[in-house]
Amino acid sequence: FIFDEGHQLAGKCLDQFTLLSRSPSTRQALRETAQWLIAQHDSLSEFVGQEGLLEELRGVLTDLTQLNDDVAAWGESYLEQHAEQSDEYRFPQGIIPDALREHSGALVNVWRRQLDLAQRLEVALDNRREEAEIQLRDTVDAWLGSVQAMVARAEGQLELWHSYKSAELPDLDEPWARWLKAASRNGEGVVFMASPVLARDLLHEHLWSRAAGVVMTSATLSALGSFDRLRSMTGLPVDALYKRVESPFDAQQGVFAIPDLQSDPGDSEAHTAEIIARLPDLINGDAGVLMLFSSRRQMEAVVTGVSGTLDHEILVQDSLSKSRLLERHRENIDEGRRSLIMGLASFAEGIDLPGDYCDHVVIAKLPFSVPDNPREAAHAELLEALGRNAFMEISVPDAALRLVQASGRLLRTEEDRGRITLMDRRLLTRRYGRAILESLPRYRFDLPAAG
């Protein structure tokens, strides 16, 4: 196997094993399944001769609909009481309240019954399929498809609710994050979610122990000059080999600058105001500019604050599709107009803007993780419970990696030159700053004098 962008492997693995139950869509699926059973009842009963099974299945669907409504109502109430300003709530240490575990236990029992009935119906249909007349085969296949969807849905629901039912005590060996979030902006409906916190055991079971050979490549596999973070996230075998290859591009053709700032990102209002005040002079004369933010709120505030003060057309992430936005940016440069892209984390990797398309990358602040990401918060909580420093073990290495990714948008060919400006003095004032600075490519540095 060869995995490009290998730094994403652990996250993609955890995404794959994340469980969820979205109460509105579950209710809709149950309702549609019940209607399908009613519509197909006579034909199905005549074909498979399972009258009692079909009636029992209809009853189970009714019970599941009620249980789904009950747990959704509980979740809506709990979010309203505990989520404060957010539409999301993570259960500390993954431990589920007693009332929700009771709901979960009831759901496990009835979903298991639905799974058993659906599997029996699937077997009955499959056994009779070969005996069916040719003109009935398409109908039987359609029935099988519907029943197999019921089986798959029940299996997914069972995994989620079993995870909740069993979450009475913290598990430091195989930790899980569990959380709720609103299913819609109006607060109606709840999404119940659960995810493993660590990918290493999953990757060992499903990849490292099975593959004869694996190659992982990425411009950002190492963080802070080592592969420790990668090993921690992925559980790579002890005999894995590591190699850092220098970029073919000359980092000396780029300048990495930190202005002499008066504000700190810890004071978001003052920091945003200083960015707005400095940006016109900062990018004056630059043709193509890419500005990257860690916060959508700050990005939107800066867009509003600099409107009408720049010579550049401002292209904001999500105002157009990503491909169209990049196309518009290139058109601006090709036609002699200045252009400024403002984007979030997804614009910090995988974007190629060589030459004049990007001669200045502006980074609003050090790209630390969003602290309310449930899985990352659960990981930090786990490390703290083990007496370790989550900030230094997770946040700083990840920020260093993301800063390298963001800075890497500047030099895309051997001829490229330009400037990277980080609007964050913490790289110079905090104890972790030197380690992050030393992990950057060998740019020419333009830093304010100490003191």
Located regions from the model:
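ASCE RecA-like P-loop NTPase motor cores
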Residues: 1-451
